[in-house]
Amino acid sequence: MENAARNLTSRNDDPAFWADADKHLTRYGPAFEDVIIERAEGSFVYDADGRAILDFTSGQMSAVLGHTHPDIVSTVNRQMASVAHLFSGMLSRPVVELAARLAALAPGLDRVQLLTTGAESNEAAIRMAKLVTGGHEIVAFAQSWHGMTGAAASATYSAGRKGYGPVSAGSFVIPAPNAYRPRFRNPDGSNDWQAELDDAFHLIDNQSTGNLAAFIAEPILSSGGILELPLGYLAALKKKCEERGMLLILDEAQTGVGRTGNMFAFQRDGVTPDIMTLSKTLGAGLPLAAVMTSAEVEQKAFEKGFLFYTTHVSDPLPAAVGVTVLDVMARDNLVQQAITRGKRLKDGLLALQQRFECIGDVRGRGLLLGLEVVTDRHTKAPGFELGAKIMEEAMVRGLSMNIVKLPGMGGVFRIAPALTVSDAEIDRGVEIMADAIVAAQG
């Protein structure tokens, strides 16, 4: 912030605002953008100059209905006028209705706990798995992100592990399959994910003390660079877990609620996890999360005294928002729209790949897509700096995108517009990306 070069004629250059920001805000991640966001609507956020910025990350990969959706605004106003927060042992109608609605959408996952954030829901899921199995060892992917709290942070390997002391005992990791950069290859050069998975679990078995509790996974690793688990992988992973008495936890923070073209990403594979967590997309940008599990697992947890009280567990306000999100998803056929709009966006990105050598790979599903930037398409040399320049040039032109930089990969853009995005907005975004690439390459 303090080193930002701002246009002195812009309302975004508010000296008092930036002085207070520099003085009082904790710097919790990368540098803040050099704009002041005053409002948001649909697929756009608007800065202090009134400039429309096309949001291709749905806020923090969450606003599946776009910003300030009128149905959500109406629900918040209505619920605030009745009851928003309760003692954690009290129930309200929105909580029970949302739990029933979610259970109907995910047969086999009949029990639901409503919380606030993805990290919190993963904490609850891991805690439940440890209690039910009697184990304490948790396995995750090397490119994972499950949150920044305790057990969730211990299962997060894509960033944020250095300098914080020991993680939870029994934290193990395996590589995620990467079709663009395979570690194990079939004779035709394609990714041999089964051999990779077998090898990984051989190492897990060697490390384990016999106390394996769960594997926690994202169906598409977002912060890991949009790495999609190939068809068949989840079934093989579930089998590995069953053979060892482990539970399979799926973290569908970003893939859940229609974004991939299924209501939940695991449904493409026909593999039901033992526990599923939802967050980001469930509240469409408001703080709502859920832990879903089978009646059998929940009964075992209950009998063993499962305890997970939090301040905002089962709050009626976010639950009412969740019900409205599901209503809008069904009414506006947004799961199907994720397929059709996703195809249009992916076709646009593939066209850019044909035009620009710096685009090494386009991947993902529905409206959760990735674009990997490289400096050499043949060697796949990472293009971190070029990717950062592209992101900057896109922002200047009115497109907000997010890029992740990980060891062994190029800079990967995570592209996830709202499910309500229009064809025209998709085309505009792709056009701005093309202009940004040209400008970044000089």
Residue positions per predicted region:
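Conserved N-terminal phosphate-binding loop of PLP-dependent enzymes in the Aspartate aminotransferase
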Residues: 2-442
